[in-house]
Amino acid sequence: FERQQVAEMLWLLNAGNDDGMKEYLQNAASENRAWDGVFRDVILARGDDNDASKGAAGFYKQRIGDLDRLTNDVSVRFFGINVSCAQCHDHPEVSSWKQDHYYGMKSFFSRTFDNGGFVVEREYGFVKFKTTAGEEKHADLMFLSGEVIKEPEAPEPDNKAKEAEKKRLEQFKKDKKPVPAPEFSRREQLIHAGLKPGADGFFSRAIINRLWYRFLGYGLVMPLDQLHGANRPSHPELMEWLARDLVSHEYNLRRTIRGLVLSAAYARGSQWGDSQRPSASYFAVAQPRPLTPNQYGSALIFASIDPENFRPHTIP
């Protein structure tokens, strides 16, 4: 179970073959670390050599140089919302998604950068964008729910202060140490906003939808990255109940997975009678699915490997 869970989480987070991320997720699966804890570790990315969250910074490695990709990936993978359509204009089909939402999410990462392999955050920096009318705006620090987070004044430093900051960062880089987090961290504010009760439940519903898709072959909301009011779940009461249950049991994914695989919906066969096969969204019959590339490759490795060399908590 743990091996497969790590593989699925690597796919979900699109972490590729980053060794640090693999090790982090292996430990998280072994300890049954809560999903909100994984979210915190990944977003903060502050683990050092003696920290259990070491390796979680791997999520940023392929993204830290591209804030637009980082913004949308966090939104898609943790909140089930693809906000990229609201980058250049308000969403054409979802009236609730505005440019303010996209750039509000981007603002959580606008002060984040790499310093000697460490993911660090400075105390200043704002996001500007132009509306379709040509108006230039400063983006508010705004979560997907529309909540605007108040923050202390953070004026742009003068050239002398920037030069001093540059020297300070170089020293941390030479010492191979992380830069201390700012007193007001925008990434910390994202965690608070995302996990806040009543924040439209994006965080809990997104992982429930992905787990349902993983085991049942079709999400309660499809596509998986379109979890918004204009795209209602096929079974809204079930979605809300599962999300509440997950939160009330401290984001214990193993417990939720156990419930799903013991359910009547999961146990259904894939054969149907002579009548028309029902839509996949009814979950009245199992959906035949090919193996994923990862499953197929893993199966070949498992079938051919020497059992004596098969070690627990290792992904070939």
Listing of model-derived features with the role each one plays in the protein:
Residues F1-H313:
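Primarily short, surface-exposed interaction patches in extracytoplasmic proteins
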